[in-house]
Amino acid sequence: MIHFDQVTYFYPEASRPILDRVSLDIDEGELILVIGPSGSGKSTFLRCLNGMVPHFYGGRFAGQVRVAGLNPVEREPRGMSATVGFVFQDPEAQFVVDTVEDEMAFAMENQGLSQTLMRKRIEEVLDQLSIAHL
């Protein structure tokens, strides 16, 4: 489901890579925890999954990333948003609304989905995850 092959990434103006020849495979349904000290590349690693690295940040990127068969480097982040999402360690700095339902709606509104489809998807996900109370 997620495949990294020799991924190396330098931020602009950096003399050392933040990711250096990272190779790994994560299978569908597998649960992983991305941990490490501040500045170790955790967020950069995650941003490779949705294409924010290198599209938004620039810099030098080498290697291959695949997520559900898609190449985030070849696609724009908008094209990956239906497949990849994540919450950073400080969700207060990331979320723009107060409820899970409104946050889900905000993301789908940005994708241009109809109100009817948004309502259906929100209800399905809230029920599947048993988080309708949030």
For the regions a language model picked out, list residue spans one by one.
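Conserved ABC ATPase "signature" region
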Residues: 69, 116-134
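Short helical segment in ABC ATPase nucleotide-binding domains corresponding to the A-loop/adjacent helical element
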Residues: 50, 85, 92, 98-109, ...
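ABC ATPase NBD Q-loop/coupling interface
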Residues: 51, 64-79, 114
